[in-house]
């Protein structure tokens, strides 16, 4: 992949050049809370902060930076709740001394005029790219036509939205075919980290998987047990997905989340792990509640004694300690998915135990985006206490599955 330095050389410098940057600014918003300007409150600005170094590098070199990004999943038309206006306000705060403008459209005469008005070292954020049907269209002609409009706004393209590189979208894939291009610093770092996880990881290698559904992790488990993990490595499973693992081994799980259609496949994972010498670590106790609510009656119970009228919402304290012990001497750790419903304090302790184990251990630890990143920040852990916090949940998983990611392939 070309770097920013390569692109700067190719262009003869960034000064005066219009550079279209595809960033990942897809941050969580709390629409029930408002800031001083009346905008929804951003609850985790990690992706914004991760985007700043690439933007600052271009701005300091005199580029006229045009940023495009998505927020949420609008259906190809404007929806007020998905506007990037709150993101614009926070981005301006993160770039002091920079003129940061906002354009309420993405392409067309208004966008062209706004880009033309930029001076060297200024930035323009375009409105949500997914307000345009062409961005995500499965029709190649429609998507490519939209990419033509985007490319007309710039002299070069920088791909820095790692969280979207697994999508064959106009602003991720097609624009790169139309302009001189390079990977931004964030994308380059993410790829370097993932290569470290897949090429020659230090061992013992421990992978911690959580989240609600095992069906969301099938591809990555297939690849982990098929090639990445070997004898002496560990696969630790928690979160809602663990109840399918427990049921596959004969345990009753009450009203806990269960994917009955995956039981046979999960039973196969258990056998494969045993045959390969991969230690499969499952909880021995869980926090079982009468309802999915923070104030519901709840108790710690053994996994062989989950009441029929209760659902598991976190791994228990004994399991948290056991997980921490299996992570203590690991040399490489990848973690994707919380151990419980961390947003509710009674069910946050398992996730906290895993996070603390990574902080205390000596492994190169990677927190795999999405809910995992939100969890560690919500629980008060600083980013720098981990080896790397990825900005790409789905993209990271697909990379670990061994899939080709369109947004990376086009940069190669």
Curated annotation (Swiss-Prot):
This is Phosphoglycerate kinase. Transmembrane segments: none annotated. One of its GO terms (biological process) is gluconeogenesis. Its EC number is 2.7.2.3. Its main location: cytoplasm. The keyword Disulfide bond does not apply. Belongs to the phosphoglycerate kinase family. The gene is pgk.
């Amino acid at each position: 992949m070309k770097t920013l330095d390569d692109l700067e050389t190719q262009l003869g410098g960034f000064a005066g050049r219009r550079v279209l940057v595809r960033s990942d600014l897809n941050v969580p918003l709390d629409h029930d809370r408002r800031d001083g300007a009346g905008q929804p409150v951003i609850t985790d600005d990690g992706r914004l902060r991760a985007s700043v170094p690439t933007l600052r590098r271009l701005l300091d070199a005199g580029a006229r930076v045009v940023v495009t990004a998505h927020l949420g999943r609008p259906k190809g038309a404007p929806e007020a709740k998905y506007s990037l206006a709150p993101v614009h306000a926070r981005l301006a705060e993160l770039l002091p001394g920079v003129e940061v403008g906002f354009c309420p459209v993405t392409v067309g005469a208004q966008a062209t005029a706004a880009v033309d008005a930029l001076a060297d070292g200024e930035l323009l954020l375009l409105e949500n790219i997914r307000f345009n049907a062409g961005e995500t269209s499965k029709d190649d002609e429609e998507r490519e036509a939209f990419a033509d409009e985007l490319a007309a706004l710039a002299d070069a393209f920088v791909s820095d939205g790692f969280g979207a590189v697994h999508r064959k979208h106009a602003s991720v894939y097609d624009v790169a075919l139309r302009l001189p291009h390079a990977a931004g610093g964030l994308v380059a770092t993410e790829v370097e980290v993932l290569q470290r996880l897949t090429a020659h990881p230090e061992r013992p290698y421990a992978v911690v998987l959580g989240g609600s559904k095992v069906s969301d992790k099938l591809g990555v488990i297939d690849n982990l047990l098929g090639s990445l993990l070997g004898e002496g490595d560990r696969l630790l499973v928690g979160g809602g997905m663990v109840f399918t693992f427990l049921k596959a081994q004969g345990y009753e799980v009450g009203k806990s989340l269960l994917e009955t259609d995956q039981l046979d496949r999960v039973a196969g994972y258990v056998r494969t792990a045993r045959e390969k010498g991969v230690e499969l670590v499952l909880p021995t106790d869980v926090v079982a509640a009468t309802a999915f609510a923070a104030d519901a009656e709840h108790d710690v119970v053994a996994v062989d004694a989950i009441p029929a009228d209760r659902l598991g919402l976190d791994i228990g304290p004994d399991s948290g300690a056991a997980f921490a012990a299996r992570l203590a001497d690991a040399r490489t750790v990848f973690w994707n998915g919380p151990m419980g419903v961390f947003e509710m304090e009674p069910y946050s302790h398992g996730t906290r135990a895993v996070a603390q184990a990574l902080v205390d251990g000596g492994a190169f630890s990677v927190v795999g985006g999405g809910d995992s990143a939100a969890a560690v920040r919500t629980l008060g852990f600083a980013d720098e206490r981990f080896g790397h916090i990825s900005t790409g949940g789905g993209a990271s998983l697909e990379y670990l599955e061994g899939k080709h990611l369109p947004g990376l392939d086009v940069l190669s």
